[in-house]
Design a protein with these regions (language model features):
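PRPP-associated nucleotide enzymes
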Residues: 1-194
Length: 194
C-alpha cells in the first residue's frame, strides 16, 4: 500500500491532529500550527499503515534496534520494530531533570545498528539527543525515520533520513513572534517537561 501525501494530511486533519492557535513548541520556537500526532496514534490501523510505509525505506538496512524519544517516539518505535522484523527491538529515551536519558534497564549493545524514530521534527533537537545517547553506548545510528518533518526539509542529521511527510510550517523565535506581539497567550502542548 502506498500512502499519498494528500491522504496523510487528510487523515491528520480528520483526526484533529493539525491544530491552529499560538503554540510554544518543544524546541522553544513559536508557531501558529501544532501537529498533535497522539490524535493519529490512537488509530492503530492507520498508525501501522504510516509506519509500514516509512519502514519500507529502511528494509535492507539490517537494523537491530529502534529508539524513539518519549512520548511520541514510544508508539512509533514499537510499531516500526514490528514492521521491520521479529528480532528488531524497540526502546525509548525519556527526560529526567530536563536531560534525555536511557532508563528502565534499557540497553544499547556495542555495535548495534540503530534506527532513531520521531513523530514530528521541527529543529531536530530531540532526535540529536537520542543519537548522542546511542553513540555514547557504542551503538551505530544507521538512520532516522520521521513521520512529519515540519522544518520543510531543513534539518540534517548526517545519516540516512527518511520522512513520510515534509511540510514547511512557519516558526518564530519568541522575540520575533507576531502572535506574542499581538498579546495572544502561547500554549505549550509538547512533552518536554514530562
Amino acid at each position: 500500500m502506498i500512502i499519498k501525501t494528500e491522504e496523510v494530511m487528510k487523515k491528520f486533519e480528520e483526526a484533529g491532529a493539525i491544530q491552529k492557535g499560538h503554540f510554544k513548541l518543544t524546541s522553544g520556537v513559536h508557531s501558529d500550527t501544532y501537529i498533535q500526532c497522539a490524535q493519529v496514534m490512537q488509530h492503530p490501523g492507520f498508525m501501522h499503515n504510516l509506519c509500514s510505509e516509512l519502514g519500507k525505506k529502511f528494509r535492507g538496512d539490517d537494523i537491530d534496534l529502534i529508539v524513539g524519544p518519549a512520548i511520541g517516539g514510544i508508539i512509533m518505535a514499537h510499531v516500526m520494530a514490528r514492521v521491520l522484523g521479529p528480532w528488531v527491538r524497540a526502546i525509548f529515551t525519556e527526560r529526567e531533570n530536563g536531560k534525555m536519558t536511557l532508563r528502565r534497564s534499557f540497553e544499547i549493545n556495542q555495535g548495534e545498528k540503530v534506527l532513531v524514530v520521531e513523530d514530528v521534527t521541527t529543529t531536530g533537537s530531540s532526535v540529536r539527543e537520542v543519537m548522542d545517547i546511542v553513540k555514547s553506548r557504542q551503538g551505530k545510528v544507521v538512520g532516522v525515520g520521521v513521520l512529519i518533518d515540519r522544518s520543510g526539509g531543513k534539518v540534517n542529521f548526517g545519516v540516512k533520513t527518511e520522512k513520510l511527510l515534509t511540510v514547511d510550517i512557519k516558526t518564530y523565535l519568541p522575540e520575533e513572534c507576531p502572535l506574542c506581539k499581538k498579546g495572544v497567550p502561547a500554549i505549550k502542548p509538547g512533552s518536554r517537561e514530562l
